[in-house]
Amino acid sequence: MNQAQIEKAIQALKKELINRFGAEVELRIFGSVARGDYREYSDIDILVVLPVVVNNAVEEQVFDLAYDIELEYGLVIGTIVYSKEFWYSDRAAAMPLYKKIQREGLFV
């Protein structure tokens, strides 16, 4: 896995998500790729914030899109999906994951 491959995969996923859910989709990369200490077989951790209510069906749509990108680019993508309403709430701000992503996350 190299940086160019990672960037192409992330942009491809972002394009598919915007096509499906609209221009207000937000992506943040976190974990080893964001820190720059990833290895050849690391996964790409991506927070997906959507402008719609997130339920199981919506999550499945995101996971399916990510899976298609995984197959195309030969990478592993770990997605976490939240609605914009939840992600920008006090409840989300109390989560350790939120704090980690705020600290090291990179907007795409």
What is each of the regions a protein language model found here?
Residues 45-49:
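Short beta-strand->loop micro-motif that forms the acidic, two-metal-ion catalytic signature
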Residues 1-25, 35-40, 51-108:
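Catalytic core of pol beta-like nucleotidyltransferases
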